[in-house]
Amino acid sequence: AIISGVVAGGAGTLFYFGMTLVTLIRTKHPWLIFLLPFGGLVIVGCYRLLHDEHDTGTNLVISAIHSDDNLPLKMAPLIFISTLITHLFGGSAGREGAALQLGGSIGNGIGKLFHFDDKDKHIMIMCGMSACFSALFGTPMAAAIFSMEVVSVGIMYYAALVPCVISSLVAHGIAVSFGISQELFLIDSIPSFGIGNAVRISVLAILCAGISILFCVMLHQSEALYKHFFKNPYVRVFVGGCIVIVLTLLVGNQNYNGTGVNIIAQCIDGTVRPEAFLLK
């Protein structure tokens, strides 16, 4: 667990600095958005170069824990490079998924290196996920729990709890030693809890659940449509990049490109536009 925390935590720390750098470059040079389709071509080329043409992302990490699917170590540099390229040119790829894939592939590689059995190797995958997530977001306890939860909704792998916590804390220590601090969103006051607020929170929870379901359905359906109309992955990614450019031009700004941290800050400040969730 300590080794996983050091290695995956180091990778997560490097990933953090990489994300910070490309975001800064994109912010200073907004014209980079017009190179997004070409960045997509580079990403597809990288995956094909390493013979990983059918990558399934985070799903592959989860499958590796459940059904012993092969989780190649080459996924680490692929997800690292492709995520940085995506954000450099204005794409919006979630850092959470990248952290899980990066850490999971490193954890699996460590498990293979020490010839662990399947059970211990699965724990190492979760340790790697926890470590990378912790280093990137600065939330060691949340990283440990999240990595165990995401593997199977409603089921907790308690045998992995202590190793994941250790990996997360080690990774967090490494990140802090390099000067990384977690992003804080301060709330001035919290309203008292009562019947009225309970009803509002319940309605909000239902709406968020509905939007989440709709978002997942749209992701799967759009992927199927892209593959149906554009068989060639190079054409597919180029068209996708062009669509993002058109949407960005229609919105008139790049507030919805990249990580979306600015949108979270606006939500906390109460200055966010009502349709921001839909535009994002």
Could you tell me what each predicted segment is?
Residues 1-280:
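Alpha-helical transmembrane segments and immediately membrane-proximal extracytoplasmic
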